[in-house]
Amino acid sequence: MAKYDDIINGIFFDRYEAGATSVRFERKDLAAKAHQLKIAVPKNLGDIIYSYKYRKSLPQEIIKTAPEGFYWRIKNVGIAQHEFVLTQGSEF
């Protein structure tokens, strides 16, 4: 699953600006980032999103950008459209 971390980190940091409270991306961006990183494109791109929503924490590099008392989560915002959203509270 390290490839998922590489892809999601790339997506986040390509778009993140210090102080941002949300970072939008589209599902097709996952495939583009995998190609750019020379990683085999996962057959089910949705599994990348699902993994970070329900199975595992986001990579530490992303977690560290959240201010104290906040965490990042991935939210669906449309058909094949997603957003990292800074949320107050605890991830678990």
Would you name each region that the model predicts?
Residues 1-8, 37-43, 47-91:
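Charged low-complexity interaction tracts in eukaryotic proteins
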Residues 1-28, 33-34:
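Positively charged, polyanion-binding regions of nucleic-acid-associated proteins
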